[in-house]
Amino acid sequence: MVQSRNMEIRVNARKSDAFDIFNIKHYQGANPYLETGALVFNFTLTGYEEPLEIEEYLQIIGEFYPQMLYVEGGYNSYAQLFARTVAEVGQLDMGLHLDKWSCKQGEDEAIIAVQSLHARTSKSVVYFVWDWFEAMTQKQKIVFDEQIRVIQDMFRRSAYGGPTVYALLRTAAVKGIPTFYLWDEGLMQYGYGKKQVRGIATTFDSDSHIDSDFTTRKDDCKAFLNTLGFPVPTGSIVLTRDEAIYVAKSIGYPVAVKPVVGHKGIGVTADVQDAEELKAAFSRAIKAIPDDQPTRVIVEKSVSGADFRLLCVNGRFVAAMERRPAWVEGDGRLSIDELIERENRTKARRDTPTSALSKIQRDEAMELYLEEQGLSLDSVIEKGQTVYLRKVANLSAGGVSMDATHSVHPDNIVLAQDIAQHFRLTCLGIDAIAQSLSNSWKDGGFGILEINSAPGIFMHLNPATGESVDVPSRILETFFASDSDAKIPLITFNNIAVEELEAIIDYILLQHPDWTIGAVCKERVFINRAEKNLNKDYNSNVQNLLRNPKLDLLIAEYQGNILEREGMFYTGSNIVILDNPTETEMMLARNMAEEAILVTKESNSISIKRQGLIEQYALGENEPFSRVYLKEIATIL
């Protein structure tokens, strides 16, 4: 499939194309081309269409990515320019940490590797950049912003695209904590073997599922908080609209209405003033209840004030946020609907995993609230007039987050921590209404609305207003004080026979009989000496071993053909043992832990690199290589 520019048959290119891309391959981890997950592909000229000069492409690209104009030494080839462009576009204008790339130029073609997290998104980026280069060649324009939005949305819908998931994943990468997605389970794993933690967003396997379920039973939870002496609004659970009207009349308007089981403020209506509003609010609450849940709605006294979220991690207060409903400001010319559309086009509301604001959502609740104000989506409001679009400060519907961490009264911090310490949950969000968090809850005017066992955290990391609070770090530091706390010993060979692998397992178990050792080579998979199923996908075997929550140590073989085909699942080996390695297998020596030991055998010559020093000697006649590497393995046990 290697194509030169003079061959007539291309792999993917059309007759009008100047460039061709083929042999696209996605690696989940380190590979021969890049030390991270990557999309790798071949790039060449077709010979059909004469390309522009490199500088002409660069000037157009520089209008969108001016940082590309200032590269020392410039770009030596079309492939190099293409690779850098893919890397820039691949960050999707939302600061993704996917900025690594490489370009290996051959005689007729280049092999390009760009850092990748989600294969489908990365492929879309490559094809978009290819279309862009062809359009520039033909002196045509493309709808750049629209194409970027489509790819942004693709990433946002991926397993990595949720704001909380991405914030934790990126922070783990910075801290050197190994992280990978478990597709069959729909969970993220942080760390290896017995050091691992698994979870999704801010819910982790160490959390009590009983406590987590309890937080969704808003009525019981409220009763529990009341027994602790904390301020909760009075109210009742109702099953019918007539019951709702009766309860509201009993406790007095205004009231708040919300489903017993719900999240993200969906179906919640605050400040309901009369029976007519109550009927509409009750209907919205009913619609928000999942099909598999009973029809139960809370009607409670509405507390006046601002909407706040207090966040605790591991029982400790870490952040607070004020949440305000979305609003628009009139210009005397545009309708409210047009003002919303204009606001939704702003950079801050791109609704990506790294944007501070979501898009403003139009729905029945918005239209009813506008109607209460004597307005509609078609209304044109005066210049400078501010109109709030809903009663509830729902961030997922376009609400605005404002950091309040440093203004919280000490009594309110104690309240949050007292509540959090009654639950075995890593993260706990406490939603409250108050005039200000700077006033003690003991002075009145403070009501706890509900608690949340899976709170979103990106709003604290990137609030619309105020200082950032690095909540992802606080969460990960709950489990891992440093990156070493997330790792088990990893021993990597480029070539090892089954008998030698079994001998190493026995050697380690003699010293640590209570350990669980995982081992894999091209022929077998072991847990201790018990043989396990060998998956045809080699890295699935490695992942399954590292997924084992009892695993103390991993031994893995990575031959060159496996590295070329699948790449390497993990990095950070503690010992790498190379027996007459190929050029490809030498990548194992590049992906070691900082204090790792490298043992290399070339013919009869031995080289051992440890702690910056190199020891070299020749094997004695009939001296086995195992005598060399077993001594080194002993140093990490």
Predicted segments, located by residue:
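ATP-dependent carboxylate activation and anion-phosphoryl transfer catalytic cores
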Residues: 1-171, 316, 324-331, 335, ...
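Active-site nucleotide/adenylate-binding loops and adjacent lid/helix of ATP-dependent enzymes
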Residues: 12-14, 197-363, 410, 472
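Conserved N-proximal alpha/beta basic substrate-recognition cap immediately N-terminal to
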Residues: 113-250, 263, 499-500
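Short glycine-biased active-site loop of nucleotidyltransferases that positions the nucleotide triphosphate
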Residues: 191, 247-249, 311, 439-443, ...
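Short acidic loop-to-helix transition motifs that present clustered carboxylates
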Residues: 238-244, 435, 560-563
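Extended, charge-rich helix/loop segments that form flexible
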Residues: 339-399
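Glycine-rich phosphate-binding P-loop
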Residues: 488-510
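ATP-dependent carboxylate-amine ligase catalytic core
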Residues: 506-637
